Regions:
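Histidine-centered nuclease catalytic patch
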Residues: 305-338, 354
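Intrinsically disordered, low-complexity N-proximal targeting/linker segments that flank membranes
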Residues: 227-314, 322
Length: 441
């Protein structure tokens, strides 16, 4: 102001300065910063809730973020553990790459999040607290619960994290190996992401005890009962904790875990498995591949075709176009009973024609009829019924074969019931007309 006080245009310049002060400077000097005061007794879970309520950016303050802040107060950088640094890969990267196929960008554990990892550690920590309380003579309700809830995570001490982090990571890596052995190679084929947490914790706790054939058989039974009983779909925290304790005890000679006892599988569920997002739907696909199903055209097992990234997906055995023309109801032909894993190339050959016609195409490329019959049987498809386009008989027989396959996996009978009434959940399969790649489905 003093610099321009004697100039001819002082008034104009002064007016501009006033405008700048009013419109810019005052916005800074008069800005009110909101402040929320929380008492020292406020629980960590309540802090998260308050943050989520007032945060207009939409960023959730999840358990990992709050635990990161808690550990930082003790000089420990949890984010570096998980995400890594320029100098080295973090735990997230190692899990994401675990058992990754050469043709894939990520492995079967790519869906494991930081909260999943903390949950597994929490199972060990709360188990230790419970055992310690038992040693002090406490019983019944006096004993703390083994738990992996959000509230428990927010009280996970740094010492417990340091104690179990490497053991739990090894458990997740063992879980990846376990899933690969079940022919579950990709995260999109994983029935339940939530079931990976107790699986990793169980394998971490058992260590080499999990390697015996008897132990592997029990863990597999537990896993498939969880999948086909559809017990990990929602509200899983209690089941995760129970399974961690009960499956380990079962492997070491105890009684059957509640997941194995609770699982109820009905035959009519096969008729309503139509959506690719269904855990049981994915489970049937994995069981078929695990029993050695071979591609109709190439005769390769699906461990090989997935390894070489040949776009394996689940497709109709009796093509949907043919079914529509024949007058078969969508609720019938769209179920998992009429679907099986096939490569995209084989599915293009199948197209929308009658099975007898596409089998002739396959054999026209040089495959012997008995070779093709063997491949069909590997999918639990009756060759004679498929060759005569007998949908009803083939459908009924394959339903029975799939029931037997599931019974073998879960180690107990499936409840036999009549097929249900129609519902509205269907899958479209555009690749029967034109291959769009498995990622388009």
């Amino acid at each position: 102001v003093m610099q321009y006080s004697g100039t001819a245009d002082f008034q104009a310049r002064f007016q501009r300065l006033n405008e700048f002060h009013e419109r810019v400077i005052k916005n800074f000097t008069a800005y009110l910063v909101p402040q929320i005061e929380l008492s020292a007794s406020t629980s960590k879970e309540a802090v998260c809730v308050v943050f989520e309520k007032v945060n207009t950016g939409g960023k959730a303050l999840d358990a990992f973020e709050l635990i990161t802040a808690m550990y930082a107060a003790d000089g420990y950088e949890l984010r570096k553990d998980w995400f890594g640094t320029e100098e080295g890969e973090g735990r997230h990267g190692r899990l994401r790459a675990a058992m990754r196929l050469p043709s894939a960008a990520e492995g079967v554990l790519s869906g494991v999040g930081n909260t999943d990892f903390l949950q597994a550690i929490s199972l060990f920590h709360t188990r230790d607290l419970r055992e310690s309380a038992k040693g002090e003579g406490k019983t019944g309700r006096e004993l703390p619960q083994v738990s992996a809830t959000r509230q428990v995570l927010l009280n996970l001490p740094l010492d417990a994290y340091k104690q179990y982090q490497h053991r739990v990571e090894e458990g997740f890596l063992s879980a990846a190996k376990f899933l690969i052995q079940l022919d579950i190679y990709r995260v999109k084929d994983l029935p339940y992401q939530s079931q990976v947490v107790p699986l990793a914790a169980i394998l971490a706790e058992l260590g080499r005890d999990a390697d015996s054939p008897a132990a592997i058989e029990k863990i597999r039974r537990w896993y498939w009962n969880g999948v086909f009983g559809e017990l990990y779909g929602s509200s899983t925290e209690t089941r995760i904790a129970k399974d961690f304790i009960e499956v380990v005890d079962w492997v070491r000679g105890g009684s059957e875990p509640s997941t194995v006892r609770d699982a109820t599988v009905r035959a009519d569920r096969l008729d309503t498995m139509r959506m690719r997002l269904s855990a049981a739907y994915k489970g049937v696909n994995a069981l078929l591949m695990n029993r050695g199903a071979e591609d109709f055209r190439s005769g390769q097992t699906f461990s090989h075709t997935i390894f070489f990234d040949e776009n394996v997906d689940i497709h109709h055995i009796f093509p949907q176009d043919w079914c529509k023309k024949t007058g078969i109801s969508k609720q019938v032909y769209d179920s998992i009973i009429n679907k099986t894993p096939l490569t995209a190339r084989t599915n293009r050959i199948i197209g929308g024609v009658a099975p007898s016609e596409y089998l002739a195409r396959i054999e026209g490329d040089g495959a012997e009829p008995e070779e093709v019959n063997s491949r069909l049987r590997s999918h639990l498809v009756d060759p004679a019924l498929l060759r005569t386009d007998d949908f009803e008989s083939a459908f009924r027989k394959r339903r029975n074969e799939l029931v037997a396959l599931i019974e073998k996996a879960i180690g107990k009978p499936v409840i036999i019931t009549e097929p249900p009434e129609a519902d509205g959940d269907f899958d479209e399969d555009p690749t029967e007309i034109e291959d769009l790649g498995s990622d388009a489905l």
